[in-house]
Amino acid sequence: MSSSTANVDPAELAKFSELAHRWWDLESEFRPLHEINPLRLGWIDGLAPLQGRRVLDVGCGGGILADAMARKGATVTGIDLATKSLKVAQLHALEAGTPDIQYREVSVEALAEESPASFDTVTCMEMLEHVPDPASVVQACARLVKPGGWVFFSTINRNAKAFLLAIVGAEYVLGMLPRGTHEYAKLIKPSELATACRSARLDVLQTRGMEYNPLTRRYALSGDTSVNYLMACRRAEA
């Protein structure tokens, strides 16, 4: 993919732009991201402590994870191509007094050309299933992290169980997400993501599943990667 061609689906941008003002409403369509945030934040910080690190959050949206990582002591840059979401993230950081955080409207591929090997940690959470070319995003993340640095991904598996739970259940039965949030064909199997990571010269060190309890509204790590899963990678030392 050329650097002049944005790896973005206009329909996806429009979808999130329409909801931008609700990013920080804990009872909105983004409630699942707020509920999942403590789990993914703890997982990231446990493997690659955030204190004093330079971190990039790819597809940051309204800044839910980026803000939390900054509060853990990281210097955070959040990037996204949804202008309205970025404005919400910037306003929240200003109102909350979040330290050491900035937001930019730039593609991950363009930033990789501009600032390769610039970050200790790169996160790309719940984003790959929304772009036309996820492998391009993985390649760019690998270029942006320093040798020895960590890259974290999370996405949704592609199988019948994931379709029933993450799409039919979450969007149509429970109403946890707006209908049409996810497209089955864009979901990514762990083996496919691992292949993309290895092609980008990232070592896959850990893959964990995430399970949701609708009664307690809490997520927990598990060994079951059949629906939501996380993948931790490292770039080899130079």
UniProtKB/Swiss-Prot annotation:
Pathway, per record: Cofactor biosynthesis; ubiquinone biosynthesis
InterPro entries per UniProt: SAM-dependent_MTases_sf, UbiG_MeTrfase
Residues holding S-adenosyl-L-methionine: R40, G59, D80, M125
Keyword S-adenosyl-L-methionine: yes
Catalytic activity: a 3-demethylubiquinol + S-adenosyl-L-methionine = a ubiquinol + S-adenosyl-L-homocysteine + H(+); a 3-(all-trans-polyprenyl)benzene-1,2-diol + S-adenosyl-L-methionine = a 2-methoxy-6-(all-trans-polyprenyl)phenol + S-adenosyl-L-homocysteine + H(+)
Pfam families cross-referenced by the UniProt entry: Methyltransf_23
Alphabetically ordered keywords of this record: Methyltransferase, S-adenosyl-L-methionine, Transferase, Ubiquinone biosynthesis
Top-rank lineage group of the source organism: Bacteria
EC id: 2.1.1.222, 2.1.1.64
PANTHER family: METHYLTRANSFERASE, UBIQUINONE BIOSYNTHESIS O-METHYLTRANSFERASE, MITOCHONDRIAL
Recorded family membership: Belongs to the methyltransferase superfamily. UbiG/COQ3 family.
NCBIfam families from the UniProt entry: UbiG (TIGR01983)
Name under which the protein is recorded: Ubiquinone biosynthesis O-methyltransferase
The organism's taxonomic lineage, starting at the top: Bacteria, Pseudomonadati, Pseudomonadota, Betaproteobacteria, Burkholderiales
Gene: ubiG
